[in-house]
């Protein structure tokens, strides 16, 4: 989906950051919450056709390589092609389950910095690279931002 997955448990880290009061639980407008839920659902569903297209393209290229060059460059890449669509479907199901079970929450956090690939680090959640799901695209260090957590994904959202 959108955010980056890291080794340690996202919920645990969010709780720790909240306990240390570097993350403050946020109450957001009904409207913004609905927008978040819609966006989270659609971006997880969007991954499904993309994953099949990627898999089909890569498998076609592999097939042509094997057919014409008798190259057996299959292993890892083919495995990825099989796993990616399965993961995408799993992710979409997990996301809609999370929405149904209200497994999402919002916080006010402070931007620490932005890294090269456009993701942000938030105070207390430094090891996570957090991307913007919608709203404001550019943040500066020290800015306050709304951090949304759904399942183990973290995203930045804003009204504007």
Give the ranges of each region predicted by the language model:
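Short, flexible coil/linker elements and helix-boundary hinge sites characteristic
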Residues: 69-70, 135-136, 155
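A membrane-cytosol interface segment of integral membrane proteins
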Residues: 139-160
């Amino acid at each position: 989906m959108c955010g980056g997955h890291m080794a340690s448990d996202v919920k645990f880290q969010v709780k720790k950051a909240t306990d240390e009061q570097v993350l403050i639980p946020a109450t957001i407008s009904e409207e913004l919450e609905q927008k978040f839920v819609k966006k989270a659902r659609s971006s997880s569903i969007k991954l499904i056709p993309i994953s099949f297209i990627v898999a089909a393209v890569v498998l076609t290229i592999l097939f042509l390589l094997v057919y014409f060059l008798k190259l057996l460059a299959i292993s890892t890449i083919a495995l990825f092609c099989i796993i990616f669509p399965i993961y995408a479907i799993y992710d979409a199901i997990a996301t809609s389950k999370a929405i149904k079970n209200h497994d999402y929450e919002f916080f006010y956090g402070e931007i620490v910095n932005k890294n090269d690939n456009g993701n942000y680090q938030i105070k207390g959640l430094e090891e996570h690279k957090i991307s913007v799901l919608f709203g404001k695209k550019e943040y500066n260090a020290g800015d306050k931002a709304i951090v949304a957590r759904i399942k183990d994904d973290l995203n930045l959202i804003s009204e504007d």
